[in-house]
From Swiss-Prot:
It is an enzyme of class 2 (transferase). Keywords: ATP-binding, Cytoplasm, Kinase, Nucleotide-binding, Transferase. It comes from Nitrosococcus oceani (strain ATCC 19707 / BCRC 17464 / JCM 30415 / NCIMB 11848 / C-107). This is Cytidylate kinase. Its EC number is 2.7.4.25. GO terms for cellular component: cytosol.
Length: 227
């Protein structure tokens, strides 16, 4: 790790398990954690709340610059709690429609520029673990360790389906797989900060791995050993 405040980035597509892994690493190291995707989801939710269309870049830029968002780390194994304008929105931002809206506004240069410095401000001692789609390529290109976590579209849809069923929310597996494929296309083809692995990232396919197995495989990398 560098002498500067160290950063570990975990990038990857929706449903790859990057958020779970990043939180586990942050808890293990007792570092700060940033869910960058949640910032776009919160912005999408705020835009809907204030009647701002997803194709209004200037209005979204202003909203992003003044976004009243707060993250509170969850207990071990639990996701971070997210607050928008003082109200908890942890569940609301995880809905499929919010994720799809976030993917659309994330393609806007004005939005990404407005959130860039806010994301970098999370870099505080003793260190930061962050997950997203461009953490290792754009936000923290100098990160000490970059991980790109992926999984097959079907497996990612299956995981999402299981999550929704456990929450009592109805879902269709085939529709989820189509939505994930469409989101992948948008994320990979956008002109600004497309989803891709950094040249110096370690790529890990989690399709056939349990959460604990992914974590155990990554642990040695913290000391510079990718075995």
């Amino acid at each position: 790790m560098s002498k500067e405040i160290p950063v570990i980035t975990v990038d990857g597509p929706s449903g790859s398990g990057k958020g779970t892994l990043a939180q586990q690493l942050a808890q293990h190291l007792e570092w700060h954690y940033l869910d960058s995707g949640a910032m776009y989801r919160v912005l999408a939710l705020a835009a809907d709340k204030h009647g701002i269309a997803p194709n209004a870049p200037k209005q979204l830029e202003t909203l992003a610059q003044n976004l009243d968002v707060r993250f509170i780390s969850g207990l071990e194994g639990m996701p971070a709690r997210v607050f928008l304008e003082g109200s908890e929105v942890s569940d609301s931002i995880r809905r499929e429609e919010c994720g799809n809206a976030a993917s659309k506004i994330a393609a806007l240069a004005e939005v990404r520029g407005a959130l860039l410095m806010r994301q970098r401000a999370f870099r505080k001692a003793p260190g930061l673990v962050t997950d997203g789609r461009d953490m290792g390529t754009v936000v923290f290109p100098e990160a000490d360790l970059k991980i790109f976590l992926t999984a097959s579209p079907y497996e990612r849809a299956r995981r999402r389906y299981k999550q929704l069923k456990e929450k009592g929310i109805g879902a269709n597996l085939k529709n989820l797989e189509k939505e994930i494929a469409e989101r992948d296309r948008r994320d990979c083809e956008r002109n600004i900060a497309p989803l891709k692995s950094a040249d110096d990232a370690i790529i890990l396919d989690s399709t056939n791995l349990a959460i604990k197995e992914v974590f155990q495989q990554v642990l040695p990398w913290l000391s510079g050993k990718n075995t």
